[in-house]
Amino acid sequence: MTNLSVNVNKIAWLRNARGESRPNLLELSELLIDAGIQGITVHPRPDLRHITPDDVYELSLLCIKKSVEFNIEGNPYSEPTKIYPGFISLIKDVEPDQCTLVPDSPDQLTSDHGWEIKVTEHNAIRDIVEDIQTAKTRVSFFVDPNLSQINSINEVGAERIELYTGPYASNPSPKVLSQYEKAYHHAKDIGLGVNAGHDLDLNNLELFLSKVPADEVSIGH
């Protein structure tokens, strides 16, 4: 069975835009959990445009209470600032079930590509993965359906990949879908779990899962 994790960033974004406490992030997240989802996903960015560190701690406690998975996305190179504790520090403090590493820049509106790990970067990235895993957190990498990059992710010690599904959502053709199907089977063959996310919704998810029965999909922004 494929687990469903809902990204609640935009609930926090709307709350912050209003400058008030509503919509209430915790209340709506609990409603989602009570409706049957298996996980909550957040992407706390250094500029705090939506999810804040306080949100991360509160959602972590909610997920523990409700026995659902908590997935934190972000760039491992995001350093501490006056308002942000740094991504790795936050992960090691919260110890989420899963950490999804995303290669985005601080001012990027949304994630729009997967990792391109060079051979010369393997040792440094492997150290990051091992550091996160000391928190008993599963490590996943956001990746395009690129077999060589999936191999690299396996070599640095991650447990899962998250297939970036933006291109599929824009063009759900058999040719595009076949690329994801090949990537899925390759990842499984070398022992990786497979998640998928980005612009997936009720209109395109059923077709995707018919060919790519991922361990987890995430929806929302």
Where in this protein do the model-derived segments appear?
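Glycine-rich tight-turn/loop motif centered on a GG-T
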Residues: 16-18, 109-123, 166-177
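N-terminal small/glycine-rich loop or linker at the start of catalytic domains
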Residues: 1-17, 109-113, 125-134
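Glycine/small-residue-rich loop that forms an oxyanion/phosphate-binding "nest" at active or ligand-binding sites
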Residues: 60-118
